[in-house]
Amino acid sequence: MKSIYITGYMGAGKTTIGKALSKELHMDVVDTDQKIEENQEKAILDIFAEEGEMAFREYESEMLRSLPVRNAIITTGGGIIEREENRKWMKENGIVVYLYCDPHVIAERLREDTTRPLFQKKDIDAFVTKFESRRAYYEEAHIHIDTTNKSVKQIMNELKEKINE
């Protein structure tokens, strides 16, 4: 089976659904952000602070190409879709899943999370604007799932159905 790339904005449920799908399909799950942190030996927050977003995006593109294109669940960082080369790579080498969640629901979920470099609690309007600027890229995915106010079980049932179509 081709690898499954799970995309979506921060807080949409990519990691949670990736782990659940991994168990269900008996496939390894790989988190691009986690792999970047391991390779760079620093937290993403520190990469952003010390090297900037452009350096992080380069690490992200390199990481994407190093991952298996068969029999893996790949959970991606929310901004991986900003580069056309990444979107093209994922579409050509796997099944791309977009997990949508209402940005106001995401903002509420992330309110206490201090590990997200692009999420500023004080500026929800900027957060929503960033979300909307990426939306068309996310929508290039093969499969779209709305996770807003749904349980993991509901999302998984819908996702399995769409993967098997």
Swiss-Prot record:
Top enzyme category: transferase
Chief location of this protein within or outside the cell: cytoplasm
Entry annotated with the keyword Iron: no
EC code: 2.7.1.71
Gene Ontology biological process terms in this record: amino acid biosynthetic process; aromatic amino acid family biosynthetic process; chorismate biosynthetic process
Key words, A-Z: Amino-acid biosynthesis, Aromatic amino acid biosynthesis, ATP-binding, Cytoplasm, Kinase, Magnesium, Metal-binding, Nucleotide-binding, Transferase
Gene Ontology CC terms, in alphabetical order: cytosol
Binding site for substrate: D33, R57, G78, R134
Residues the entry annotates as binding Mg(2+): T15
A single MF term (Gene Ontology): ATP binding
Reactions that this protein is recorded to catalyse: shikimate + ATP = 3-phosphoshikimate + ADP + H(+)
Cofactor: how bound: Binds 1 Mg(2+) ion per subunit.
Localization of this protein: Cytoplasm
CDD domains documented for this protein: SK (cd00464)
InterPro entries, sorted: P-loop_NTPase (IPR027417), Shikimate/glucono_kinase (IPR031322), Shikimate_kinase/TSH1 (IPR000623)
Function: Catalyzes the specific phosphorylation of the 3-hydroxyl group of shikimic acid using ATP as a cosubstrate.
Subunit and interaction comment: Monomer.
PANTHER family on file: SHIKIMATE KINASE, SHIKIMATE KINASE 1, CHLOROPLASTIC
The protein's name: Shikimate kinase
Organism whose genome encodes this protein: Bacillus cereus (strain AH820)
